[in-house]
Amino acid sequence: MPQQLSPINIETKKAISNARLKPLDIHYNESKPTTIQNTGKLVRINFKGGYISGGFLPNEYVLSSLHIYWGKEDDYGSNHLIDVYKYSGEINLVHWNKKKYSSYEEAKKHDDGLIIISIFLQVLDHKNVYFQKIVNQLDSIRSANTSAPFDSVFYLDNLLPSKLDYFTYLGTTINHSADAVWIIFPTPINIHSDQLSKFRTLLSSSNHDGKPHYITENYRNPYKLNDDTQVYYSGEIIRAATTSPARENYFMRWLSDLRETCFSYYQKYIEENKTFAIIAIVFVFILTAILFFMSRRYSREKQN
């Protein structure tokens, strides 16, 4: 059978339950970004340290790089789709099987060599303070085929979605140069339109006519599923799959991001301005309570 090309549209109702898909162990606490690149086609951040294990993985897969995709408009820009719903953008985290193979180049030659985690970006009216760390670096790589040191403290854990249930399938890298197992989190992280628009100001490598060309979009359209391609789901996706992610409660996600922002202010100002820090942590507790009760109400509505 022909190789399944990526990306794809995931039909949640056709995904197959698999008891082997346990929660992933994500160890990004020691991952450090070293350089950020404008490849002329996308933004790439190279990492040192960090790995994933657990779940269905036979051993540890070390983090290699992060790639970001977007579109001309905020309404679309992700490579993968969930029930034909396209998100504003997509982050791909590329990992390789270091225990089994001696290098990334060697690992990409094998169907168990690469694992790619996909995180969707959804534009709302609230800035993501963690994603802003990446946005702040873009001025240093505005020209195509340039790279620069990533000169800011950045914790990749903060870009993980609030729910880590996932879909998985065997496909290819986005450029189809190698096989890859995909792990796709259907719960997105939220960013602001201004943050995403900054990526569209980067120059592309197609500059043959002497005029500046910008990377206004770089996402790929989905490929048709092969007859033998199987998509699996984990955890509580079986319940979430009855409702398309496009219909999720965006207000709850906005509150969750606001809570994270308040907590970051608390950590930042606890030494400099204790009064402001106390106000921030009070808001964290209030928002946590609101989210708890709204989550219970939302769960009851889905059951009815």
Swiss-Prot record:
Induction: Expressed in the late phase of the viral replicative cycle. Residues 1-235 form the Alpha-carbonic anhydrase domain. PROSITE patterns: ALPHA_CA_2. The lineage of its organism: Viruses, Varidnaviria, Bamfordvirae, Nucleocytoviricota, Pokkesviricetes. PANTHER family: CARBONIC ANHYDRASE (PTHR18952), CARBONIC ANHYDRASE 7 (PTHR18952:SF124). One of its GO terms (molecular function) is carbonate dehydratase activity. Its main location: virion. It is found in: Virion membrane. Belongs to the alpha-carbonic anhydrase family. InterPro entries: CA_dom (IPR001148), CA_dom_sf (IPR036398), Carbonic_anhydrase_a-class (IPR023561). This is Cell surface-binding protein OPG105. GO terms for biological process: symbiont entry into host cell; virion attachment to host cell. The chain crosses the membrane at residues 276-294. Binds to chondroitin sulfate on the cell surface to provide virion attachment to target cell. The keyword Protein transport does not apply. It comes from Vaccinia virus (strain Western Reserve).
